[in-house]
Amino acid sequence: MASGRDERPPWRLGRLRLLPPPPLLLLLLLLRSSAQAAHIKKAEATTTTVGGSEAAEGQFDHYYHEAALGEALEAAAAAGPPGLARLFSIGSSVEGRPLWVLRLTAGLGPPPTAAAGLDAAGPLLPGRPQVKLVGNMHGDETVSRQVLVYLARELASGYRRGDPRLVRLLNTTDVYLLPSLNPDGFERAREGDCGLGDSGPPGTSGRDNSRGRDLNRSFPDQFSTGEPPSLDEVPEVRALIDWIRRNKFVLSGNLHGGSVVASYPFDDSPEHKTTGLYSKTSDDEVFRYLAKAYASNHPIMKTGEPHCPGDEDETFKDGITNGAHWYDVEGGMQDYNYVWANCFEITLELSCCKYPPASQLRQEWENNRESLITLIEKVHIGIKGFVKDSVTGSGLENATISVAGINHNITTGRFGDFHRLLVPGTYNLTALSTGYMPLTINNIMVKEGPATEMDFSLRPTVMSVMPGSTEAVTTPGTVAVPNIPPGTPSSHQPIQPKDFHHHHFPDMEIFLRRFANEYPNITRLYSLGKSVESRELYVMEISDNPGVHEPGEPEFKYIGNMHGNEVVGRELLLNLIEYLCKNFGTDPEVTDLVRSTRIHLMPSMNPDGYEKSQEGDSISVVGRNNSNNFDLNRNFPDQFVPITEPTQPETIAVMSWVKAYPFVLSANLHGGSLVVNYPYDDNEQGVATYSKSPDDAVFQQIALSYSKENSQMFQGRPCKDMYLNEYFPHGITNGASWYNVPGGMQDWNYLQTNCFEVTIELGCVKYPFENELPKYWEQNRRSLIQFMKQVHQGVKGFVLDATDGRGILNATLSVAEINHPVTTYKAGDYWRLLVPGTYKITASARGYNPVTKNVTVRSEGAVQVNFTLVRSSADANNESKKGRGHSTSTDDTSDPTSKEFEALIKHLSAENGLEGFMLSSSSDLALYRYHSYKDLSEFLRGLVMNYPHITNLTTLGQSVEYRHIWSLEISNKPNISEPEEPKIRFVAGIHGNAPVGTELLLALAEFLCLNYKRNPVVTQLVDRTRIVIVPSLNPDGRERAQEKDCTSKTGHTNAHGKDLDTDFTSNASQPETKAIIENLIQKQDFSLSIALDGGSVLVTYPYDKPVQTVENKETLKHLASLYANNHPSMHMGQPSCPNNSDENIPGGVMRGAEWHSHLGSMKDYSVTYGHCPEITVYTSCCYFPSAAQLPALWAENKKSLLSMLVEVHKGVHGLVKDKAGKPISKAVIVLNEGIKVYTKEGGYFHVLLAPGVHNINAIADGYQQQHTQVFVHHDAASSVVIVFDTDNRIFGLPRELVVTVSGATMSALILTACIIWCICSIKSNRHKDGFHRLRQHHDEYEDEIRMMSTGSKKSLLSHEFQDETDTEEETLYSSKH
């Protein structure tokens, strides 16, 4: 049976689509249809009929033809109170029939007397979301036409009688019902026609309009390659589009017939594959939610098995389907609503039979009533509010509302109102409007139920009216625009920078802070670290969502002033900052660039060298190098030449920066010539010759994009007075062809990261005089902008997991014949610069099957190509599990609060997610002193007294001098076991002379308690985590240590002089270590441990012992790197401690044995015997810094400590049970190369793992071993349920085989024994002389046997014998004898 969305592909209809059905077949199908109807009625027997009595009894026995439809709608409107309904027409069909719409919402007032058409609909109501339901788009699909009339009567009469649900609905919702979009087709259709085949040529059946056009293929389509469809043949579609454009519909349903399913966008795809291709929107989760809301309330649809004649085997999981996955529909209405309007529309197939007999109408109404009302109610989910002018307070119409991470914007209505449909989660929303500064609100929580309310107040770019000017008059629906004084550039004339002078460091710092303060909605000022002379290495980020990487948005950087005396790049980047900030929101080019790109501008990489340079310098090297006199552009690792000079702080900072962000394109701004220089910069021979990179064509293209906008550079003869013979065709050159530069930054970017970088020489004079600076801006401003635009060339997209649709981190994208792969970022997003052409691109990832696609790249922007990878071992795993129980891996949960928490963890894991949380913390701390043992004890008791419901204080044991080793648990149920919650411990003070860790843990404890129930993030973390804090492991040593003693070892050991970090062995000798081992580590119920120490600034991971294979190195290093990366300086890998100033620790992370090798360490014991990963954090170079440094140390470590609380909720959490559902505790979970954890009470286990694919083996006594694979995400936990089968094996073999073999063996043994017995019996009855022994009484016989056993010849002779024959004489003789 053909569905209502469109005609099925021929393969779906088979012979029914090609030949008229013979009469006998029609009879069989009608009989089958009757049986199907009986099946449906049986399935619905338990459905309660609600509201049916509200309609007149006679309305279910006929269809509404011609004028009867309008009369029925008028009657429905009359069923409600005055001012509730408004009937109007949006236009006419081909044959002139009106396209009626009934509007239902409270407070409409009396209808206008002279209004007609769309004007008769009445005024819009501020803040009230608009919902439309459209029926009978295909004229022969008639159920929708009828049920919308019934719905109208139900809503109106229900409002009149005071039904609370319907009153609330119509008081808050603007509902529009269009029962028939194709009234002409309806009049041609025939009652009882279930749509089993075509009824004639186009235009003669009821499906199409009167001109033979399918209305659901006549809308503009985003994936169409031809001209947009003409609307002349489809006045119905033209009328609908006009109506949609005049309104801001939020939600819509398109009601069809021919199946029973809810379909959602997209309806087609670029490939237009007939079926089976899931075409996902950016709002796929929302659409699935809406479709499920309808289907779950429909008694047939929710089963997912409509059993429609002709498609009996067709099923839809949960009763929903993606449109294109079902079958491709080009030009459909639901996609048009989503792509070209604010409206989220789904398509609803209401019945198998398109035009069922009128006798079935009551049942169809009862089937769909609850679903229809529920769908309308869903317009109130997500986030709603108003966008207003901060000066006038008027609403801003058509302001854009964007959601970070979702590539689909909506716009505000006439009053500035918006309703953004979203599923539960945490979101960052941005409102922007031309002429206003954009505003972003972060961490907006959306919960199940009514929408979260959030208003935006936007500042105009011109903040006040000039004196003497006339203020603009504001009326509803308009935006106030103040009069602009003469000479002010218009929106088509970009504002040029005015600040042209040399900025020394203090001046540059003020400049950057000023623009960061004036334009907070598009800027973020941050530092990469410090130069040798401790000057900040500033970077200004410019983006419409500063501080956040938006998936799919490329990142770009400019670096200036790498050589301190080459200053033009420094000043141009300051000019560029001013230009971008002042023109955002008014200049289309700048606005589009900032909205689509995350831009990072570093004006000075060498601020120390700059301060030594001299204005007017053309050729000298004064100030070129950094303060350690190293050339920074010879200081990067090189592919051809070993760089022996020590890596400089500025170099380390930049390398850490570039590896932390997904940069796509970059330029390094220099001076001394006028040319764009591209990789490679050197070669193996070290001579000046062309050194081509694999992407030579790309580098030439992006280099030309800069040079051709600079006319002097493009000429190719830059410095005639200085270098007479130097010539660069078109102003570009290969680096090594010009001269060899080993250790250059641009080659390192290309070889070690995804970033393509070129070096741009901006002028022959390195440090020009100040009055020449405007000339440099004028020469380079277009080049700077055009070069940034190159970041949007080539190929972009996402690499996704086919199982759950999530992005795959670090997947590899390879281009055939170009030996330079790139990798994906956290959301699976990638960018690959390419010149126009056709390429074969392969996406691959560990644990997945690679996918290759042919891609054509054009010159007009990047082409988007997504890859969906299937996990490589899925089939093998499924095969291996047959007959042996099973395991399932899933990230889904039906618990709304769990979903909400998962969304929170994902948000906090995003870039700057934790920073936003810390800014929102309602309470923070001011550390000002150290705590002695007595103070520490009182502090902990005070926390327990003030927060008794979330804290529990216990002692693990006592030190040598009988001081308690306190343990504080923070949890929502601290005295109740919750094995399903992850457990994390923070420990400090193992060395008493390093008490900074102790103070940081006390601060962490207080921070969590203070913010509990005051900050939603802290509250959820505490509610879902068991946090154990042990602030002082060595209280005796702490009492002896002295403040401000940075190097002393006093207090390093315990009272027995033992370094406790060498005493964690199986025969621990000290009471402190025994207490920790027995009461903390050996409980084996922790998922993560963080130990704080002092003496440097880095993180170490196991093992500390010198010779030890690190089985789970990837995970341990991942955890250590996570702490370091959230620390402002640790990740730079340069502690700069006085006793080791040249120390370089890549990423701030090192294996313990490489840092300080020793045996008996706490973290080694924790990993080996506690099965818990532990990292050691060294918080400061000074063991015992002054108390005045504590606030700074808390600020540095706070984010890292909190990141551990977030991280403990990732990895894999699972449940192990048997087939009966009984949890199995103490099962062994073996991961990858042998890491072991044990299931807790209730069968729960949790283990942290680095992102990627991991193998899991589960072992339990009496059960068969289970194996599965799980994919771990970087921002969420993966769940796995392992179900065991009872182990019926004996000696490793199946029980049945062992029993069979054993039975056969026993039978053989018994048979053999019998045969031997028989043979022996025969032999024993023979005697050599023909006599045998007389038979005696039983007792005598036993005695004789015993005598025989002696083997005595004498006894043998005393026994009588008889021959083998038993004659009568012998018997007589025997009896007488």
UniProtKB/Swiss-Prot annotation:
**Domain Peptidase M14: residue ranges:** 62-379, 501-791, 929-1208
Instruction: Tell me which parts of the chain lie in the Cytoplasmic compartment.
Output: 1318-1377
Primary location class: membrane
What are the positions of the active site? E349 (proton donor/acceptor), E761 (proton donor/acceptor)
Binding locations of Zn(2+) 2: H563, E566, H670
Name a GO CC annotation attached to this entry.
plasma membrane
Q: Which residues form the signal peptide?
A: 1-37
Query: What GO molecular functions are on record for this protein?
Result: metallocarboxypeptidase activity; zinc ion binding
Which reactions fall under this protein's catalytic activity? Releases C-terminal Arg and Lys from polypeptides
Q: Tell me which species this is from.
A: Mus musculus
| TM regions (residue ranges) | 1297-1317
Q: What is known of its domains?
A: There are 3 carboxypeptidase-like domains. Only the first two domains seem to have kept a catalytic activity.
Required co-factor? Zn(2+)
Which gene codes for it?
A: Cpd
Q: Which residues form a coiled coil?
A: none
Family to which this protein belongs: Belongs to the peptidase M14 family.
Spell out the protein name for this chain: Carboxypeptidase D
Matching entries from Pfam families are given as: CarboxypepD_reg, Peptidase_M14
Modified residue annotations for Phosphoserine: S269, S1355, S1358
